[in-house]
Amino acid sequence: DYHVFSTDDVMHGEIVDHGVVLKVEDIAWAGRQLWDCDVAFKNGKYYMYFPMKDQNDIFRMGVAISDRPEGPFIPQSDPMKGSYSIDPAVFCDDDGSHYMYFGGIWGGQLQRYRDNKAIENPCLPADNEPALPGRVVKLRDDMLEFAEAPRAVLVLDEHGEPLKAGDPHRFFEASWMHKYNGKYYLSYSTGDTHFLCYAIGDNPYGPFTYQGVILTPVVGWTTHHAIVEYKGKWYLFHHDCVPSGGKTWLRSLKVVELEYDAEGKIITIDGGGE
């Protein structure tokens, strides 16, 4: 089930739980497992993008629509054409165009695809090979389908080479995009190495040059996140497992103010883990 929380004071305000806004039983093409979702706004409507396994146990992206941010959200009858993997994050650029960033390896099934087509014998690259990239795709004006074929999101080192699969700062899952001082900040989770990292580019498609760590490891393996500007300040939303004693399936929402230095670099935040 998905819930919506709201507050008007990010650091100190009361949190309101608006209850269940979408559940598996509501979705016609459902198999099982709703994973991390995102919501975008356009023309008075709220569009929730969610990954879910279909009846063949393959992840697809779905869309559900509401007139209000607190829901309820009504799902479309079919998944988005050409969609796969997990962790959709939708970014609205200054010209009103919307882009979805998505993908996750291991259980997120990204390794099952090459050039947007399923392959018969999926495998992960060797440590000395380029890491599997996430994906980005422009959305159609109606927000319900892809406007084009998804593209690879390249994260490059200082020499212009793709980060290797054995690099602890390579992409794993949980893409996010925000814009600061005219630059595009791609952030993501490194999964099994437990960092939130970021890279900067000049346009929504990249390529993006690796910059550093946003958040050091937290308690538990749970570093999905969002970066949001609200009332003139920037915030990092993430989660950890402190209240559950480190049980990774029992996650608690966290927020911390995010700051930049004079050059636009994000100041690293201590996650409090090992």
Residue positions per predicted region:
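Carbohydrate-active catalytic/glycan-binding domains of CAZyme proteins
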Residues: 1-274
